[in-house]
Amino acid sequence: MTVAHSHRFSTAVNPINISLLSKQLLQLGRTSNNSGTFSEISNQKELLVSSLISKLDDCINLNQIKQIHGHVLRKGLDQSCYILTKLIRTLTKLGVPMDPYARRVIEPVQFRNPFLWTAVIRGYAIEGKFDEAIAMYGCMRKEEITPVSFTFSALLKACGTMKDLNLGRQFHAQTFRLRGFCFVYVGNTMIDMYVKCESIDCARKVFDEMPERDVISWTELIAAYARVGNMECAAELFESLPTKDMVAWTAMVTGFAQNAKPQEALEYFDRMEKSGIRADEVTVAGYISACAQLGASKYADRAVQIAQKSGYSPSDHVVIGSALIDMYSKCGNVEEAVNVFMSMNNKNVFTYSSMILGLATHGRAQEALHLFHYMVTQTEIKPNTVTFVGALMACSHSGLVDQGRQVFDSMYQTFGVQPTRDHYTCMVDLLGRTGRLQEALELIKTMSVEPHGGVWGALLGACRIHNNPEIAEIAAEHLFELEPDIIGNYILLSNVYASAGDWGGVLRVRKLIKEKGLKKTPAVSWVVDKNGQMHKFFPGNLNHPMSNKIQDKLEELVERLTVLGYQPDLSSVPYDVSDNAKRLILIQHTEKLALAFSLLTTNRDSTITIMKNLRMCLDCHKFMRLASEVTGKVIIMRDNMRFHHFRSGDCSCGDFW
């Protein structure tokens, strides 16, 4: 029996196998001593090397590697770069630290080849010891060993992980000089390095100069453009891609979804299906995210169908289940979100966080907090930063100051989660909504991190609710420095001045907006009719085919609401115009147009769901609440802050928003 046919290692260290290998090696040595030809000796040595390589492939721990290394030393193969390279790569594969064992392996080798050096460089890089990896490359060059393409691949990966752009450029230059650039996988690694170093223009230059590309070259750059929000360049590359695989389609679908272009995401998903590519879990999750942004029930139903058709039942796939919970919540159907949550066999922190956030945005604070308490006391799942955002948002949307403080204090004290700017935003929002503006300002001053625009924006929004121009100016000053081009901040300050009757302040802000060349985001509300068609409404929109009927319905509705005591809240109009002009402006707000259209086109018992891109004003909130009473309709209204469920004259927010 030859060495090549010796028994392979079992899953544990097996002395019998080692003993058998020793006997075979001894027999081989005797045979070689009796052999008369160099050819026979060479063949026997090749069999020995082949057997050792095979045994290294089967190693599952360091002890087994050391036993093989012992045989290598005893048989005089300690100078074999081929075997030692394999040994080093096996150490790396098993996660064994390079120091001290790997270094001891290579130090006695007199003539180290580039593959052995590369194995060591790669091992240090994978271990995260990038300085050592670079130092090993320096030693290699001192020995005048010419690097191979694999060497540059390992070094470029290390530069990408370190995000060291300057070092990456140096290796790029050396790669080009030594013609390692000719290999596709080296070019791909270079693209990846530049992408990780946030130098996408350099990545594109590498791509354009590559003599040969594969699908990875294309998809790496497409995904990079998508991550930075440049969907135009991503689409241009995608359309040029000769063969579009699942990775490329996924990059486009998820890219559009993540960059707030849900309609395009759905279009690319449809194209993918028509091309015969089967969606994977990530693509389906991207599709569901796009549906959530559109906020229409017809998309929600199709998302469920696609998930099930693709073999990703929410009950068994936690990623899909969590995405569906988020989607149903954002489409206004929190009950269905709860049903999905209850049906899931496995839940993780993202599942609980999605459900807590869903309940919070729909004004069901006690249910959200109960679920949070259940998760932290009855399961082994630990809350993360998103979970705490959901719990704090529940408190904020319902004015639960004491409970909010308890949740906030428990973050670090109980769970070791350091509060972030987003958590401070929730606390400032909670204190501000309840009129504790000075306390909210003091909290900001004591923050352990620099506040971002969200923190100051929450305070400015609270000043709008409670008509406090003094603190509003403090918040606005910080906002204008942090977010100088966000027009919403200027409009919010203008509204504070308008509510206080300070029209001079309003004019100053408007002048500032004009000087900066900022453009106001136009308000738009939309609903989906019974046929699945989306209808969009803009302020004073007269282009809709039913505009005359909509205006008549609004006038009729105003008359009915007036009987209940409705009077337009003129403070919601931040313009120094007559009261009559303010009334005309208010009646043309987009959500009111959408409501009138829905009353004309829906069945008596059906729920009306309206989506809006901006925050609903105080007058529209009062209007919707009273409309739900006189029409007997359930009206679900989602603005850019939260959901409002209007039923029988009441709102789920308890008029606290």
Swiss-Prot record:
SUPFAM superfamilies from the UniProt entry: TPR-like (SSF48452)
The PPR repeat ranges on this chain: 45-79, 80-112, 113-147, 148-178, 183-213, 214-244, 245-279, 280-314, 317-347, 348-383, 384-419, 420-450
Molecular function, one GO term: zinc ion binding
Stretches for region Type E motif: 455-530
Spans annotated as Type E(+) motif: 532-562
Keywords: Repeat
Entry protein name: Pentatricopeptide repeat-containing protein At5g44230
Taxonomy of the source species: Eukaryota, Viridiplantae, Streptophyta, Embryophyta, Tracheophyta
